[in-house]
């Protein structure tokens, strides 16, 4: 009997190893002179060779239009925000639509919107310039958005258990705010600036029900006469826990939302260093004496620099070298071409 169980265990181990070994890595690039398996994500999705569990790397210099991720794969970009040179980064100059349950996207720059149409999607370390949306009226559950930069996250009324952690959600232009229509979601250790600036009123959260908001730094805009905009936090939101956040409202709101820190100002320099790079993490690091220090649950800091999914500078994927600078001369010198690469 003991030998039987040993054989069963060995068979299970071999099967697991076979599944791991079966997963393949693919490279996508359309940059001139770069050899790759496919010229676009769409082309990779159309290939019968690319299967569930594979990893697709988008190489430096790759510039694509709108793409659809239609298989349960992991798509890994180059990170974002560290260089203006097209030869050093990969970009999606359009929208990304995810239609495969269980797909994961890491370190990708998207100039448009990311439409999430299925359950169990993970976005990590991405910059989604024009916002993250639930792209369908069908129910979409268990989405995870970690350590990204975007302008808003908008779901529909049919979603549950989204996790939104350690993101920069900055200056959303939507009428109804930076976070919308979330149910039973966890919103934790984010920095949210909703419609910052004069005479820009947008709601911070609209129809966010049965959610948990904790360890965030939440800043609204100001009115046209410079007053702190008070009326549009957590509008039409019910049964929501709001605790251990730093919020740009007067302390008179303590009775409504006890256990938070109220700054009575939209001056973010009292909370953050406000120097250096946003993408690199310096700008939104906490300044000396910041009210966000130790203000989180368990006396951790509020904001994006702590926690299991703390903000990663430039959205760098793990174990992927970042090319900060690439200099290639137009012509050789003394029959040699000297290429300079800075990592």
Ranges and model annotations:
Residues 259-317:
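C-terminal accessory segments
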Residues 114-116, 133-137, 147, 152-280:
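Predominantly extracellular beta-rich ligand-binding scaffolds that present long acidic/polar faces
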Residues 24-63:
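Acidic Gly/Asp/Thr-rich repetitive segments characteristic of extracellular carbohydrate-active
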Residues 31-34, 61-64, 79-83, 221-223, ...:
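Acidic glycine-/aspartate-rich tracts in secreted/extracellular proteins
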């Amino acid at each position: 009997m003991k030998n039987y169980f040993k054989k069963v265990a060995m068979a299970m181990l071999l099967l697991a190893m076979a599944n791991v070994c079966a997963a393949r890595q693919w490279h996508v690039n359309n940059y001139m002179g770069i050899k790759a398996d496919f010229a676009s994500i769409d082309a990779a999705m159309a290939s019968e060779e690319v299967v569930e569990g594979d990893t697709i790397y988008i190489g430096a210099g790759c510039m694509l239009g709108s793409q659809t991720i239609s298989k349960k794969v992991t798509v890994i970009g180059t990170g974002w925000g560290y260089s203006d040179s097209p030869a050093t980064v990969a970009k999606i100059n359009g929208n990304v639509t995810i239609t495969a349950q269980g797909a994961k996207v890491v370190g990708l720059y998207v100039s448009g919107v990311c439409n999430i149409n299925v359950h169990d999607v993970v976005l990590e370390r991405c910059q989604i310039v024009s916002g993250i949306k639930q792209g369908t009226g069908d129910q979409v559950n268990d989405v995870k958005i970690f350590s990204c930069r975007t302008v808003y996250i908008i779901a529909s009324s049919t979603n549950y258990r989204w996790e939104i952690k350690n993101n920069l959600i900055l200056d959303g232009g939507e009428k109804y705010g930076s976070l919308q229509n979330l149910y039973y979601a966890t919103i934790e250790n984010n920095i949210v600036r909703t419609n910052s600036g004069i005479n820009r009123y947008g709601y911070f959260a609209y129809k966010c029900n049965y959610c948990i908001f904790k360890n965030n730094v939440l800043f609204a805009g100001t009115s046209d006469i410079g007053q702190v905009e008070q009326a549009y936090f957590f509008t039409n939101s019910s049964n929501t826990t709001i605790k251990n956040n730093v919020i740009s409202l007067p302390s008179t709101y303590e009775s409504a939302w006890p256990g938070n820190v109220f700054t009575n100002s939209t001056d973010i320099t009292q909370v953050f260093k406000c120097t250096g790079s946003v993408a690199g993490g310096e700008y939104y690091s906490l300044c000396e004496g910041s009210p966000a220090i130790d203000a989180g649950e368990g006396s951790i800091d509020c904001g994006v620099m702590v926690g299991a999914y703390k903000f990663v500078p430039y959205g760098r994927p793990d174990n992927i070298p970042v090319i900060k600078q690439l200099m290639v001369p137009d012509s050789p010198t003394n029959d040699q071409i000297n290429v300079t690469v800075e990592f």
